[in-house]
Amino acid sequence: MRILYICKSLPHRYQGGIQTHTSELAEHLTQRGHDISVLTAGSIRKGVQSYEMKGFTVIEAPYLPMRRFPFLPILLEELSFNVSAWLWLKKNQFKYDIVHLQGRSGFLFPKKHNETTVFTTFHGLIHLENKFSKQILNLDRRIHQRFASYFEKNAFKNSDAVISVSHEMQRELNQLKIQIEEKPRLIIPNGVAVKKSHNEGNTDIKSDNNTIIFVGRLDRIKGIFQLVKAMKKVDKNVKLVMLGDGMNRTELEEFIRTEGVSDRVELMGAQSNDNVLNWIKRGFALVLPSFHETQGIVLLEANTCGKAVAASNVGGVPEVVTHEYNGLLFNPYNIQEIADAINQLYRNPEMTKQMGENGRKLVAEKFNWSKIAADTEGVYKQVLASKKCKDELKLEVAL
């Protein structure tokens, strides 16, 4: 099959769950013999560029990065890429059997083309992310949320099939109550490249049984302030290393100083994927205190490295973390529960080690990319065959 993915950025430009998902799926479906391309954002100065990466073709469509623009920067950047993608697709859509949108990337395109079958994978919904972030939205973000919600509904309504990364994500989509004709709604989880659990990248990082790791963007929705506050109740020998960057970093740095835990909490900033994995392997466990997660890829990555996790009992997290099997679940709004989970993992190393091994087995069985690519391929074939039958039926009726 000729398949085009649309994703605003890829892991070699920006580290994130959607970016990793798109890259891994493209790579593994290429290995299964398909002709894969990924349409992503490129330089306005260079125009359309294409090159090979991991066996698939990357096509960069020129757009204007607007993050520094004084008014509506996020919305304008999103629109800039999607207009560029739409213009490119007007000329090139017929080259592909399937066009697969990742999140809101490409939302202008779906118009139920008979020649092209359109899929959309939903990784989250903007109104829920903002709701659970527990922060006051400024005017820019309120306007962005309104438009982004419309973009999501447009992609949902006009795609031939919709994929959710978890049962929780599918429940959230069902609550939108959009009046649409019946269409396939499928659940295919995110995965992890098991090979990446091997030692790569910075080999100078040594094991440290006193360090717990957080990986994620520094945003209130990730529960970062609750985590720092919980560190005051955690065993004094435990150190927290936080990997990632985000809009709340400056505020978090001041909060760490105010809470008096500067000697035990270290912000490392954004890291390469290899170094993230090595930091995970260094710690005794990983903690993710998010207020909302549709799945949580980093939990799978930690388990793949043989590490137990302490995570919020919210959203799609319980679909990948079974309490006291491959990690511990807690209420992210309860500071004491967060601290208790970290202390339990720290004070019971044999139990923590066994949870990590359980997690490694779980990921290998259910969340490896080879299996997910095969499942996705099967869904493509099923939807294409169904659409072909409908088209043939319409033709017979017309005749």
Predicted regions and their residues:
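Nucleotide-activated donor-binding/catalytic signature segment of Leloir-type glycosyltransferases, i.e.
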Residues: E253-Q271
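Carbohydrate-associated surface elements
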Residues: E168, G191
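Short hydrophobic beta-strand element within catalytic cores of glycosyltransferases
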Residues: A308-A311
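Conserved acidic donor-binding segment of nucleotide-sugar-dependent glycosyltransferases
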Residues: H323-E324, L328-I335, Q344-P349
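A conserved mid-protein helix/loop that constitutes part of the nucleotide-sugar donor-binding site
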Residues: T20, N210-K233, M247-E253, L328, ...
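Membrane-proximal helix-turn-helix segments that form the acceptor-binding/catalytic region
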Residues: R142-V162
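Aromatic "clamp/platform" in nucleotide-sugar-dependent glycosyltransferases that forms part
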Residues: F291
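Short alpha-helical donor nucleotide-sugar binding micro-motif in glycosyltransferases
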Residues: A270-Q271, N278-G283
